[in-house]
From Swiss-Prot:
Name used for this protein in its record: HPr kinase/phosphorylase
UniProt-annotated stretches for the region Important for the catalytic mechanism of both phosphorylation and dephosphorylation: 216-225
Enzyme Commission number(s) from the entry: 2.7.11.-, 2.7.4.-
Family according to the record: Belongs to the HPrK/P family.
Annotated GO MF terms: ATP binding; magnesium ion binding; phosphorelay sensor kinase activity; protein serine/threonine kinase activity; protein serine/threonine/tyrosine kinase activity
GO biological process, one term: regulation of carbohydrate metabolic process
Length: 340
């Protein structure tokens, strides 16, 4: 199954959307200082900008499409200027179609400058946080908003703290396996529609579709509300994708992995993720196997231990140790019970 599809990406967002959602997502509050139509101003980039040079009159290469941050340095610079020079410096900034201006550390603009921003249609906000913290928090929010994303058909479960995404053809029982994992104490992230965002260079964050949320469709039963039945402990909103488990129809002619020495990976939004392919046949307890997949991942990730490699090394030691063959001694594991 090809998962490396071209990701979608948000091109821009309105300042109205930005203002409405920033306080919901992060521990930061913005307060409006003027009333303008925020729907007409759009943010195009995840990066922020401190326009010190633009205020000084140098606007070559000015990245005006970014959110502009005025901190202690910028506001002190404006305040030390004479009235006409102050207006001229601020005019050199707002003559561009800026998305918005954010004042940090509860800094203030002179009333005439605020009026100039209002006439130019530039929204102005203020926050009590320092410039450093504001830039950190806003960049994190904008990074999520402008990140690549894609929706996949499958189920996403947090198993022993490991993000496991179940994929496979329809009718193989992905939802049933996910429900069984939830019943065993694990946590559902999403079912049927898994939305994956790429954050940074190699981190994939899975979440559910806003409409489907934590509902599941079980064939023969119908729609199940996991949160209502199993409680808050059975769900989580987001989880890093760490392992992909592909459920396959059993085929006697296929050559399935028997030892685990060859590590398979699959690409999602350009990021390599470990891939485990599990054939489905009668009598196989897929739920327990997926729990072992998660525990194996933890064992390898934290201690570097791989069972197949340990067994391989043990076999090599036995083969090369000729003294064991010549000793004639067996191994005692119970009194008067010997293995020759």
């Amino acid at each position: 199954m090809n998962l490396d599809q071209k990701g979608l990406k948000k091109r821009s967002m309105t300042v109205a959307y930005f203002f409405e959602n920033i306080s919901k997502s992060l521990d930061i509050k913005l307060r409006r200082l003027n009333e303008v139509d925020e729907q007409k101003r759009r943010i195009f980039e995840r990066d922020l900008h401190r326009p010190g040079l633009a205020l000084a009159g140098f606007t070559n290469l000015f990245t005006y499409k970014r959110v502009q941050i005025l901190g202690n340095t910028e506001t002190r610079f404006l305040n030390h200027l004479e009235d006409d020079d102050r207006k001229r410096a601020f005019e050199s900034l707002i003559k561009f179609k800026l998305p918005c201006i954010i004042l940090t550390s509860n800094n203030k603009l002179e009333p005439e400058l605020l009026d100039m921003a209002t006439r130019a249609g530039v929204p102005v906000f203020v926050t009590r946080h320092s410039s450093t913290k504001t830039i950190y928090l806003l960049t994190d929010f904008l990074d999520d908003q402008f990140s690549q994303y894609q929706q996949f058909h499958g189920s996403m479960v947090d198993v022993y703290g490991v993000g496991v995404m179940l994929i496979g053809n329809s009718g193989l029982g992905k939802s049933e396996v996910a429900l069984d994992l939830v019943e065993r104490g694990h946590r559902l992230v999403a079912d049927d529609a898994v939305v994956i965002n790429r954050k940074g260079e190699n981190v994939l964050i899975a979440s559910g579709n806003e409409i489907v949320d934590h509902f599941m469709e079980i064939r023969g039963l119908g729609v199940v509300d996991v949160k209502a039945i199993f409680g808050i402990r059975a769900i989580r909103d987001k989880k890093v994708v760490q392992v992909v488990v592909e459920l396959l129809e059993w085929n006697e002619e296929s050559d399935y992995e028997r030892l685990g020495l060859d590590t398979k990976t699959t690409k999602i939004l350009g990021v390599d993720i470990p891939l485990i392919q599990l054939p489905i046949n009668p009598g196989k307890n897929i739920t327990v196997i997926i729990e072992v997949v998660a525990l194996n991942y933890l064992l390898k990730h934290y201690s570097g231990y791989v069972a197949a490699e340990a067994l391989e090394q043990r076999i090599k030691r036995v083969i090369t140790n000729e003294s064991l063959k010549k000793s004639g001694k067996g191994r005692t594991y119970l009194a008067k019970d010997y293995e020759e």
